[in-house]
Design a protein with these regions (language model features):
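Gram-negative outer-membrane beta-barrel transporters
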Residues: 560-565, 578-663
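Face-selective signature of the C-terminal outer-membrane beta-barrel domain
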Residues: 318-340, 361-477
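Acidic, small-polar-rich N-terminal luminal/periplasmic segments of exported/outer-membrane proteins
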Residues: 28, 47-198, 545
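Outer-membrane beta-barrel proteins
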Residues: 206-213, 228, 236-261, 294-318, ...
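Structural signature of Gram-negative outer-membrane beta-barrels, strongest in the C-terminal barrel
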Residues: 259, 369, 388-400, 437-566, ...
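Conserved C-terminal beta-signal and adjacent last beta-strands/turns
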Residues: 391, 510, 543, 626-729
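Outer-membrane beta-barrel translocator/receptor signature
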Residues: 160-163, 174-255, 260-266, 315, ...
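Acidic/polar loop-and-plug regions of large Gram-negative outer-membrane beta-barrel proteins
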Residues: 238-242, 257-324, 337-369, 408-443
Length: 729
């Protein structure tokens, strides 16, 4: 099981040959840092009476990088548009393409976990890669693409097409609208690459342990009068055996990004195709009812349960346009579609005892997800006396339908986590597994916001609200018939934030925002006084207070205090309602930038006190929340060595505190520390810039358990080597 067929071996040899050619002649295993490429914003005429706090950024362009190119100087804040980090009353980090490339990230999860408040909540070689932000789960399916939901790859988001990965922490319903899955920990927004004024032709060959070979080509050009037209094309192929025993992967990605930037009209079109197959896919462990303690983490090189596959394909297209109606009024609109086709055989192992015995039941799953996402709005800048205004109106619509086929008539299996067994995947030949309707969701919203500036915009007050309608219907996937009542509820979420600039380089802020999740439906039981009743959307609430310090754009340091509460349903006095609540209260400190000549730091620390604040189950109130560590710490460092020009060495330490794996707090998972290391070397060969990169993840090959907020366990990533050569023609 898991061995490549002759056909796949032939394809891998072709990829390997191409990579070896790209790597030929590269004796060095190091690479130099690459300067981030920025794009000149299109000119926008601004009324003399309007005070502008930061330079305008054209459609699809990311704010200029700061902190030695590690992060962006701003981010897309939903209805508020691209906003400087110093003008934003929220905690936000925008990781640049330079950081993504130098870390040799393979997915958005690799990038996001550089943040001390973010951790993966699933294994990298799992079917999906989900995140935990401020202690709440955020699945890949809830990521935004250029500010719009429902358009990113459904299970795992690659990074080769991205200019930025933006993380806005906390619920953001008023800013972006409700996420498709109702996650509230934060918004991960993916900003696509655009053609720059300087031509780009870059080819990268890579090899990752055990023997995954890859090729990535990135080509961009601008043309026409004033370089108004742009095209950026990215293509990537990876194929081979991973560090996991008997596991193989094959990934293919293609994208075309077209854009036009005129004096008044700006538009863009992104076309993306992604395909990924994993053989011997890893799944997370569920906890058995008789488990009394968590066994020691097993080898990180074994697949669990040791069978199955995942084969998925995503196709998406996104068109956006904006037009300056006047010097102070801009209209914009966007439309996108995404289609997921997925076929998998997987089995979730159930951990039975401290000795490491587990059982599993296999299932063959097929799924399609069709998403249509629309946005439209207006932005206006003007003054009323001494007060400046940035007014924004937004309309969003997400229509998403999914079909599912699920067959589970396979014999169960048993094994032990220390045995490292590989099983044959049962044959699906002759089995009928038709697709039937599974879910339909329609999210419609209208929002209005105004940022008022006082004292020459030293004091900025943002007020806004969004009216969100949530419609949904679940279906019995066995026959496609509706299951339960149709959901149709609305809610209004406010937005309030204030920023005071003590100095141009020092901002103090406070904010209040809410998030939305679809309410639950009461069970149809005679013992319930309100059987079948659907609850209004759950409102998560966050209060935040923070300070930001920007030292000449060389270093950014932030400190934030926050309290985030999320309600849940339960039964109290025979009535089903909103009776539960989890409260995450904490503090974050993060920093990024050049602290000394040639020395750059990226990291921080977070403390979260996550408790069950309200509960209907006796004994749970006051317990620690599942899967949320008290302390998390990240520290990444780069040093441009003076003794070898062009050579940079780097390292990272990631620490995650102990967590509880069940609601009763009787099962706990030990803390873990991971150390990464690497180097890069930049030179020229025959006048052509060449960059070599070498990274090691989990340098000391520690075995550890990771936990998810749903109470699952997964085994951490084994020691992984990645080497690449990038040639810029």
């Amino acid at each position: 099981m898991g061995k490549a067929s002759n056909g796949r071996q032939g394809r891998r040899k072709g990829v390997a040959r191409a990579v070896k050619q790209a790597l030929a002649g590269s004796a060095a295993l190091y690479a130099a840092s690459v300067s981030a490429q920025t794009q000149a914003p299109a000119a926008i005429t601004v009324l003399p009476t309007v005070t502008v706090t930061s330079a305008p950024v054209a459609l699809g362009e990311a704010p200029a990088p700061i902190a030695g190119g590690l992060i962006g100087g701003g981010a897309r804040m939903g209805i508020l548009g691209n906003t400087s980090v110093m003008d934003t009353p929220f905690s936000v980090t925008s990781y640049t393409a330079q950081t993504i490339e130098n870390e040799q990230a393979r997915s958005v999860a690799d990038v996001a976990t550089m943040d001390p408040s973010v951790r993966m909540s699933s294994a990298r070689s799992n079917i999906n890669e989900d995140l935990t932000i401020r202690g709440f789960n955020v699945p890949t399916a809830d990521f935004a693409f250029n500010g719009m939901f429902g358009l990113t790859p459904y299970w795992r988001a690659p990074v080769e097409t991205l200019e930025r990965v933006e993380i806005i922490k906390g619920p953001s319903a008023a800013l972006f609208g409700m996420t498709p899955g109702g996650s509230v920990g934060g918004v991960v927004n993916l900003v696509p690459k655009r053609a720059t004024d300087e031509p780009i032709t870059r080819v990268t060959g890579s090899v990752m342990s055990d023997s995954v070979f890859g090729v990535h080509a990135d080509v961009g050009r601008r043309f026409g009068p004033d370089n108004a037209f742009g095209i950026r094309v990215n293509g990537m192929l990876r194929d081979g055996d991973t560090p996991i025993k008997d596991q193989s992967t094959r990934e293919a990605l293609g994208s075309v990004a077209l854009d036009y930037r005129g004096e008044k009209l700006r538009s863009s079109l992104d076309l993306i195709w992604q395909k990924e197959r994993i053989d011997n896919v890893v799944r997370q462990f569920q906890l058995g009812a008789d488990l009394t303690s968590i066994p020691e983490a097993p080898s990180n090189k074994n697949p669990y349960p040791g069978l199955g596959w995942s084969d998925g394909r995503n196709t998406a297209g996104v068109f956006k346009i904006e037009y300056d109606i006047t010097d102070y009024l801009t209209a914009y609109a966007g439309y996108g579609q995404r289609k997921l086709d997925w076929d998998a055989f997987a089995a979730n192992p159930v951990l039975q005892n401290t000795q490491g015995d587990y059982s599993f039941f296999g299932g063959w799953q097929r799924m399609t997800v069709d998403s249509k996402s629309t946005e439209a709005g207006l932005r206006s800048n003007f003054k009323t006396g001494p007060v400046s205004h940035k007014v924004a109106f937004s309309y969003t619509l997400l229509d998403q339908k999914s079909d599912l086929g699920f067959y589970t008539g396979f014999p169960p299996g048993n094994s032990n986590i220390y045995a490292g067994n590989i099983f044959d995947t049962p044959s699906i030949s002759g089995i009928s597994n038709p697709l039937n309707r599974y879910q339909s969701t329609k999210l419609t919203s209208y929002a209005l916001a105004d940022t008022l500036g006082f004292m020459d915009d030293r004091l900025q007050l943002t007020l806004g609200a969004r009216r969100q309608n949530v419609q949904g219907q679940n279906y019995n996937f066995a026959n496609g018939e509706p299951s339960g009542p149709r959901y149709d509820k609305s809610a209004t979420t406010p937005l309030a934030g204030v920023v005071f600039k003590v100095r141009p380089d020092l901002s103090v802020y406070a904010s209040y925002v809410e998030g939305l999740s679809q309410g639950d439906t009461a069970p149809t039981s005679a013992a319930i006084t309100n059987p079948g009743e659907t609850l209004s959307p759950f409102k998560s609430k966050q209060k935040e207070l923070g300070v930001k310090y920007n030292l000449n754009d060389d270093m950014l340091a932030t400190v934030a205090l926050f309290e985030l509460t999320r309600p849940s349903s339960g039964i109290s006095g025979n009535t089903f309602g909103e009776f539960g609540e989890q409260r995450n209260r904490g503090v974050e400190a993060s920093f990024a930038g050049e602290v000394a000549k040639g020395v750059r730091l990226l990291g921080g620390v977070s403390y979260i006190d996550a408790v069950i604040n309200k509960a209907t189950t006796p004994g749970l109130q006051g317990n620690k929340a599942i899967g949320v560590p008290d302390w998390q710490f990240n520290l990444g460092a780069e040093w441009d060595t003076p003794f070898v020009p062009g050579l940079t060495v780097l390292g990272r330490v990631i620490y995650t505190d102990r967590t509880y794996a069940n609601a009763d707090n009787t099962l706990s998972v030990p803390s873990w520390t991971r150390v990464d290391a690497g180097a890069r070397y930049e030179t020229k060969i025959s006048g052509t810039p060449v960059t070599f990169r070498f990274n090691v993840e989990n340098l000391f090959n520690r075995n550890y358990w990771g936990t998810a907020t749903a109470g699952y366990l997964f085994v951490g990533t084994p020691r992984t080597y990645t080497f690449s050569t990038s040639i810029a023609f």
